[in-house]
Amino acid sequence: PSQCAICHAWPAARICTDCIRAYARPRLRCSHCAILLPVAAMPAQVVTDEPLCADCLQQSAMPAVDTCLAAVSYRWPWQQCIDVFKFGGQPGWAGALAGLMTARAAIVEAVQLCDVLLPMPLHPQRLAKRGYNQSLLLAKALRQQVHHHAGLQRQQAVIHRSWLQRTRHTTPQSLLPLAERRRNIRGAFAVSARHAPQLQDKRVLLLDDVLTTGASAQAAAQALRAAGAAHVGVLVLARTEKA
């Protein structure tokens, strides 16, 4: 039997249903950067709206991105789980963390509507060091769960791990001050010339584990736009919050 990593209940899934209900409730977020908005919970009538935070109303940090969705906030208890998955050599967390994403109807719908689901790529050096791309594992687990949720009548989203490439090795964004992150990541992504024609007029969903400033998402979205993508949405497991 398994023990819940949050409440330590026996027997339970890696993350039990009670903890998902308690700590991963849908929250009202900016539709463009996924920052948490000052509302305790998301009323049903808001789901189809596109609320914006004050910063995005003035000037978006991710102008190449059409929409942005996040499942949870990058804080307790999810920060510890994500860090173990990403840095602790435990790829087996992918399924449980993808479950936090499929708990949100808007995320399930976004995956169902996209033409292509692209995981945020790692540079080959970082991939070799870590041993796996956590965003690719999340994408695979998410697609499987969404497909199960929707039933066999709906085609699964297509995942392409090599269409979007990391063209240069950069300092990890998490090690840099916020002001330096955009400069660090500028020009670090490109779409494979062989696959660029297949992105023409496509609805693309870019998946990453954590969104902080949006610098990586913006740089990747710019490359996808340049290749001809008609719509670029960003989907993240967790969003950091303002201090």
Residue ranges of each PLM-predicted region?
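Glycine-rich phosphate/pyrophosphate-handling loop used in enzymes and phosphotransfer proteins
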Residues: 1-243
